[in-house]
Amino acid sequence: MDEQEIQRLVEEVSLQYFGMPFLHKAMFNSRLRTTGGRYLLNTHNIELNYRYYEMYGKEELVGIVKHELCHYHLHIAGRGYKHRDKDFRELLKAVDAPRFCKRMINEEKGKKVYMYECMECSLQYVRRRQINTKRYVCGKCKGKLILIKKTS
């Protein structure tokens, strides 16, 4: 799906569910990480997360578009467009738009796990962050720590 297709989709959804035209720009924003989309108050444009389209398909994207169009049309009309406003929640129900988008399935960034062992008492420590073994000692017996295993 490219920029023209997303623009056309937003315009169609706006006419179909809201009965009003969408007169601004809709685009994908690759910098969005944790949100499905956002409505920009200054420019009245809508930005959408392309990864949601890749992961969940067109149905989820249409739901996100409906949610952002609720912000858009209420803001243009001068009514309550924020998530906590009654007008916004009522319009969400009327057009069957989701209040929140699905959670993004995170691509794990290779979680590193460091395992240290005390040379005196053999107590093992599992940490996500590397520690300076010259500076830190065992909390139980004050023995020297050594790195046993590093998994990534």
UniProtKB/Swiss-Prot annotation:
GO CC terms in record: cytoplasm
Cofactor(s) the record lists: Zn(2+)
One GO MF term: zinc ion binding
Highest taxon above the source species: Bacteria
Active site: E68
Binding locations of Zn(2+): H67, H71
Main location: cytoplasm
Cofactor info, note text: Binds 1 zinc ion.
GO process terms (BP): response to stress
The SprT-like domain, residue ranges: 7-148
One Pfam assignment: Zn_ribbon_SprT
Recorded family membership: Belongs to the SprT family.
Name of the molecule in the record: Protein SprT-like
Organism name: Bacillus cereus (strain AH187)
